[in-house]
């Protein structure tokens, strides 16, 4: 379906899709605690999604920075190279009111506008009219509060429907920001959902952030499913942090200060309230504790 020389490889694309949406998430700068890509993977799994297209990496990646990986195929001694992947998956869940295409990828190093052009080509061929991009950022927020979802949208009603807090951020952007702009210029409705992740637990998976993003997408689709797996992960995450607070009163005081700051008022967009005394050391202790606990329990 695509030219042999094109990095966009469309393997199959049914012509009878029901008002499809595109959900996109990228590992890297846009993906604090891997929250966005974990949400995308969860949706793919829950919808039994199958791959329908991919963007080959050769033109867009510096392999000295993001290296391919060697994997041994199960049950054999055959080694296989796994390249950085940007893949499109089509939902096969028949109870969904409309089809969903999920792009699970990695932020490329090169030719971002060309890269986004290939994404829009898939959207055009599939007759997608709405794009939801997922991201996650580190913020001065406590884990004891509901996850705040910030974002931007080309459609005010769409933003209100997804309950996003508007952002007036200005500054460096990632592939998500570039894709949002490309969609806008291409005439597609786009909303970008960003989970605010507590910066003191940035190096471990955050089930609360994953759950918040998944719920927003499912709410948009008006589709219910059992989220017990994610909810159980969030409960265990809280339990682990409660152990830290019980053992380390200085960490508890740090989080209480974050709670007080949040209770007074949200910090002005783009401003940081600044580091609390000794915060860097506390962050290292929290993350070390969580990593050790997950190794002991066999969690990823």
Regions found by a protein language model. Name each.
Residues 2-105:
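N-terminal short beta-loop-beta anion/metal-coordinating cradle
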Residues 26-30, 103-112, 162-170, 200-204:
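Flexible, glycine/proline-enriched loop segments at strand-loop-helix junctions
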Residues 31-38, 110, 114, 170, ...:
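Conserved active-site and cofactor/substrate-binding residues in soluble primary-metabolism enzymes
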Residues 98, 104-157, 179:
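Internal, conserved structured core segments that host functional sites
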Residues 140-220, 224:
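Catalytic cores of processing enzymes, dominated by hydrolases/peptidases
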Residues 201-300:
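A conserved C-terminal secondary-structure "cap"
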């Amino acid at each position: 379906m695509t030219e042999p020389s094109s990095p966009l490889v469309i393997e199959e694309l049914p012509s009878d899709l029901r008002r499809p949406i595109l959900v996109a998430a990228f590992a890297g700068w846009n993906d604090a605690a891997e929250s966005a890509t974990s949400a995308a993977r969860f949706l793919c799994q829950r919808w039994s999604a199958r791959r329908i297209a991919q963007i080959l990496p050769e033109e867009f990646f510096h392999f000295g920075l993001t290296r391919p990986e060697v994997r041994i195929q199960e049950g054999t001694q055959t080694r296989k190279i796994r390249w950085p992947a940007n893949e499109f998956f089509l939902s096969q869940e028949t109870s969904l009111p409309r089809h969903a295409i999920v792009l699970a990828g990695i932020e490329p190093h090169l030719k971002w506008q060309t890269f986004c052009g290939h994404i829009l080509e898939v959207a055009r061929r599939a007759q997608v009219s709405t794009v939801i991009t997922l991201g996650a950022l580190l913020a001065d927020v406590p884990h004891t509060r509901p996850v705040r979802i910030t974002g931007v949208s080309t459609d005010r009603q769409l933003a209100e429907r997804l309950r996003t807090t508007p952002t007036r951020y200005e500054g460096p952007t990632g592939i998500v920001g570039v894709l949002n702009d490309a969609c806008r210029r291409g005439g597609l409705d786009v909303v970008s959902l960003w989970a605010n992740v507590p910066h003191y637990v940035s190096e471990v998976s955050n089930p609360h952030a994953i759950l918040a993003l998944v719920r927003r997408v499912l709410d948009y689709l008006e589709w219910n499913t059992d989220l017990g797996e994610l909810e159980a992960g969030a409960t265990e995450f809280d339990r682990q942090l409660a152990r830290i607070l019980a053992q380390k009163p200085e960490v508890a005081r740090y989080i209480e200060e974050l709670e007080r700051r949040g209770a007074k008022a949200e910090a002005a967009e783009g401003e940081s309230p600044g580091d609390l005394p000794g915060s860097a050391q506390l962050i290292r202790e929290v993350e070390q504790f969580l990593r050790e606990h997950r190794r002991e329990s066999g969690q990823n």
